[in-house]
């Protein structure tokens, strides 16, 4: 199994659990700051790093039966992942390699190339009433 997180740096608790289970985990070298403005220079650095990461994913996926591209749909929609590169990867992967592509912004042309597509929509959340993020729940 290969788990690739596009918007996290590897310090989240889910990664520690995955690594204890023997899951390969990959992360970008450039860090995306979710709620900070992205300059053109930062956008270019992220795009270059994500292109490098996609090359590494492609090389490692041949030995995997499952590849999770965490927030990959958002990286694709935000022009950070090379769009044709991701499409090519999804089309040429092995028959025994299933892909999970997560994110909020799944472009319609990617959905048919994925094995799992789930859309989650917030209808209610404690944030709506001004509650702060809680340890163990939101982080």
Task: Kindly give the residue locations of the regions a language model identified.
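A generic structural signal for short, solvent-exposed coil/turn residues
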Residues: 17, 66, 91-93
């Amino acid at each position: 199994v290969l788990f690739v997180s596009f918007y996290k740096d590897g310090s989240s608790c889910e990664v520690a659990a995955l690594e204890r289970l023997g899951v390969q985990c990959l992360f970008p070298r450039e860090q995306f700051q979710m709620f900070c403005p992205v300059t053109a220079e930062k956008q270019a650095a992220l795009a270059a790093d994500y292109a490098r990461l996609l090359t590494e994913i492609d090389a490692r996926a041949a030995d995997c039966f499952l590849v999770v591209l965490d927030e990959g749909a958002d990286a694709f929609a935000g022009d950070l992942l090379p769009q044709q590169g991701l499409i090519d990867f999804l089309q040429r992967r092995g028959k025994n390699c299933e892909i999970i592509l997560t994110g909020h912004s799944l472009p319609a042309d990617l959905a048919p190339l994925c094995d799992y597509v789930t859309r989650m929509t917030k209808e209610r959340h404690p944030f709506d009433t001004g509650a702060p993020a809680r340890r163990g729940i939101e982080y």
